[in-house]
C-alpha cells in the first residue's frame, strides 16, 4: 500500500498578501527575521506558502492581540 502525504494547500504570494494585508517586501522581511512561515520552492522562480501555516500564524497574531 502506497503512503500518501497529508493534503496541504499551497497558496501564492498574492493570496498571502490578501490574507495578511502585508506587502511583499514586509512578508519577506518577516521571513528573513524568522517571524513568518517560510515559503516552499516550487521551481527555479516559483514559490508558494502552506495555507495552514499562514492560517496558524494569523491566529497567533489574533490571540496575542487579545491577550494584551
Language model feature labels by segment:
Residues 20-48:
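Major-groove DNA-recognition helix of helix-turn-helix-type DNA-binding domains
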Residues 67-68:
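Extracellular beta-propeller repeat domains
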Residues 2-26, 32, 53-63:
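Polyanion-binding surface elements
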